[in-house]
C-alpha cells in the first residue's frame, strides 16, 4: 500500500472509531453538528493544497473547530436544500476552512469537509 493510501486508510479507521456519530456544538447556528460517514469520507477525499497536513488535522478536528472563526456561508444552486457554513482555521501555516453543512429540509447539521478555499 502506498504511503498516501496508507495515510488515508489510517485516518478513515481512526475517524470511524473516534468521530462517527459524535456531536460537537456550532456557535454560529446554536446547533449540534454530527460526524457522519459521508462527511468524514468527503473530508478525507477532498483535494487540498496541503493534503497530507489536512489528513493529519482530521484527528484534531474538534479542537480546530473550537478555535476556528466563522468566515461565512453559501448556498449551492445545484443543491438548494443545503447551506454550507465555513470556519477559518490554519493548516500548514495557511488558511483552510472547515465546512459545516445544514440540510434545510431535515435540519441535519453535519461536518462536511475541510477545504483550502471557499467555493464561489
Question: Where does each model-flagged region fall?
Answer:
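Ribonuclease/tRNase effector modules and their secretory precursors
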Residues: 1-120
Amino acid at each position: 500500500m502506498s504511503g498516501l493510501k496508507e495515510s488515508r486508510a489510517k485516518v478513515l479507521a481512526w475517524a470511524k472509531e473516534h468521530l462517527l456519530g459524535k456531536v460537537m456544538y456550532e456557535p454560529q447556528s446554536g446547533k449540534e453538528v454530527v460526524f457522519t460517514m459521508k462527511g468524514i469520507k468527503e473530508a478525507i477525499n477532498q483535494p487540498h493544497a496541503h493534503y497530507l497536513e489536512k489528513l493529519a488535522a482530521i484527528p484534531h478536528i474538534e479542537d480546530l473547530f473550537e478555535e476556528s472563526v466563522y468566515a461565512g456561508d453559501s448556498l449551492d444552486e445545484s443543491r438548494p436544500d443545503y447551506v454550507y457554513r465555513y470556519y477559518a482555521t490554519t493548516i500548514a501555516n495557511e488558511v483552510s476552512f472547515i465546512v459545516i453543512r445544514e440540510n434545510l429540509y431535515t435540519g441535519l447539521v453535519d461536518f462536511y469537509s475541510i477545504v483550502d478555499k471557499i467555493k464561489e
